[in-house]
């Protein structure tokens, strides 16, 4: 159970075609061609929401009802600025059991890629925010399993990332739909092998595929190198975590900052060495001058003494 829903089974066992009728302006937003879900936009009390429910052919099939409940429970655990916020699980009139989510006003990343509308600065921002979101999820032992451009929203206001669609996500707490999941072109190759386990490295592979798509738009060598590392087929050579990925020089602007700091440090050290050498040289010169002066005075004294003696 969750803080919002007292009994999920009670909701999923209810008549799928009856329920909350407070949602207005219901509009179909997306219907999965090969999957079991459909999306609607709707308003309630003047606020816009995204509703996710089962297609009519799957409304009464227990395994898909379980899958929807699983997605809700996983989504409810995630509170991060770069992850679409899951709000409630309700019975909505005409839709059945429905996940209520925040409405994201923006475009999915695939649209921006197709339109070539990604600048170098936006590309860096998207990659950094994706890493932040995945690191947060992985720290909670949750794997997305279907990261791809169409599951990543970029808001119109601020151009911030929002990861969506946790229908294939996996957590240690759930055992529904444990079969390999993902999309061709983005799924890690090891996930297609018998007995494959969901691991952070699989998400990192998918992240690399997404980064490569972005790099092809911006022609960024740094992002291409990053994508190549993430998509290494040998899982032992692939970064084991987002934190490890960050440690590589190309992973973020911290490399540039570190380089600048190192350069400043080298300049300071060079200045200290030059100043020390100058001071020592100056001191040695002064000491040598002093010795010469003393010798000169001594010679003068001796000369005077000889003269005086002769006079005497």
Segments from the language model and where they lie:
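Short beta-strand micro-motifs within the conserved protein kinase catalytic domain, predominantly
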Residues: 85-97
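Conserved activation segment of eukaryotic-like protein kinases, specifically the C-terminal portion
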Residues: 177-190
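Conserved short submotifs of the Hanks-type protein kinase catalytic core
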Residues: 94-108, 112
């Amino acid at each position: 159970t969750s803080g919002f829903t007292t009994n999920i089974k009670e909701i999923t066992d209810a008549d799928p075609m009856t329920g909350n009728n407070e949602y207005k302006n219901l509009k179909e937003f997306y219907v999965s061609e090969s999957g079991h879900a459909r999306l609607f936009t709707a308003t309630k009390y003047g606020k816009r929401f995204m509703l996710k429910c089962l297609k009519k052919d799957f409304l009464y099939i227990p395994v898909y009802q379980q899958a929807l409940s699983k997605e809700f429970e996983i989504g409810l655990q995630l509170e991060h600025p770069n992850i679409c916020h899951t709000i409630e699980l309700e019975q909505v009139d005409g839709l059945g059991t429905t996940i209520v989510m925040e409405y994201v006003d923006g475009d999915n990343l695939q649209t921006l890629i197709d339109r070539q509308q990604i600048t170098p600065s936006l590309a860096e921002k998207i990659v950094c925010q994706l890493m932040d979101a995945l690191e947060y999820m992985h720290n909670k032992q949750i794997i997305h399993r279907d990261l791809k451009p169409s599951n990543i929203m970029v808001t119109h206001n601020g151009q911030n990332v929002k990861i969506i669609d946790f229908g294939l996500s996996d957590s240690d707490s759930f055992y529904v739909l444990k079969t390999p999941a993902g999309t061709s072109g983005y799924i890690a190759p090891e996930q297609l092998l018998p007995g494959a386990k969901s691991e952070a490295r699989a998400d990192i592979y998918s992240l690399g595929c997404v980064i490569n798509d972005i790099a092809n738009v911006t022609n960024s060598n740094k992002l291409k190198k990053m994508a190549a590392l993430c998509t290494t087929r040998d899982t032992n050579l692939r970064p084991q975590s987002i934190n490890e990925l960050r440690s590589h020089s190309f992973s973020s602007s911290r490399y540039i900052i570190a380089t600048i700091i190192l350069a400043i440090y080298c300049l300071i050290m060079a200045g200290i060495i030059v100043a020390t050498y100058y001071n020592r040289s100056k001191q040695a010169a002064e000491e040598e001058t002093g010795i010469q002066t003393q010798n000169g005075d001594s010679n003068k004294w001796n000369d005077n003494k000889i003269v005086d003696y002769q006079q005497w």
